[in-house]
Amino acid sequence: MPLGLLAQQVWARDPNDVGKRARRKQLPISQKESQQWLHSLDAVCTARDCCPTTRLVSVGDREADVYDVLAAARPAGVALLLRAAWDRCVSGPERYIWATVEAQPVVERLLLHVPRRGPQAARDATLALRFCPVTRCPPRHRQREGLPTVTLWAVQVQEVDPPTDVTPIEGLLLTTVAVDTMAEAIERVEWYACRWGIEVWHRILKSGCRIEERQLASGERLQRGLTLYSVIAWRIFYATMLARAVPEMPCSVLLELDEWQALYCAIHPCPTPPEEPPSLDQAVRWIAQLGGFVGRRRRDQPGAETLWRGFQHFMDLTKMYRIMRPEPSIRPKPS
């Protein structure tokens, strides 16, 4: 469940650095974009102070496959999980990480339903699961620094006998959390699957809130706008996921009293809302309906763009409802 935004970073690339990849390799991480992952890890470590009994796992995509990130100091209770991007050197007879993992026996075969995507039909994919500990060696170009090796656990899922016309599913995860059993390996894969939530949030921010179309005049205004719309995008995402997880809960867990009352009166329409709030699923569908969602079939789910438009109208309705509604002492009783 997306509980909020822990940290956010904004930066602009220098056009003068284009085409200078070899030179960037010699720079310290503090002068590279890779430092963003260290900043994110710092934010997780800071959050640890607020919830000392909770294990926090910082999940990163392939861009986070950086030695400095994996070797960074972390307090107890803070862990890393990322997707490997490069076939790095490791200790052992196989010398490289992919060969080391693929030399391990398959411990389980998992069945994954792959939904339809564009012209590709939906299919059921069989994934082979492997895992093992690995010792990551420091980068070769930094041998003079005397950097230590890093002990990690690798978990790989690889599609078995994929169709010839599709890209096979394959991923190799690296984590600082020990993986000793098949159940723990599956759990690490499930952890990484949660990272898809940040992609959904970005899609809401870009396609729903259309942040890229906000032609703001300066970088400062752009950052302020991004801050505002980031919270709005989170609320849309949170409302959607909460409604799917607990659809029968009253919508008062998400909406204020005036908000759900304004929504109810606008949808039906009527001057007096009921005493009890509607369900969370119904309220989210009503908000999406304000944005043009039809939902002819019950299983249809509103998308980011309709929810964004719906929330805009919903906020206007709530504002007007607060202005125009009668005082509680003179409100008509429901018939």
Model-derived features: positions:
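Single, function-defining residue in the core of a domain
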Residues: 1-335
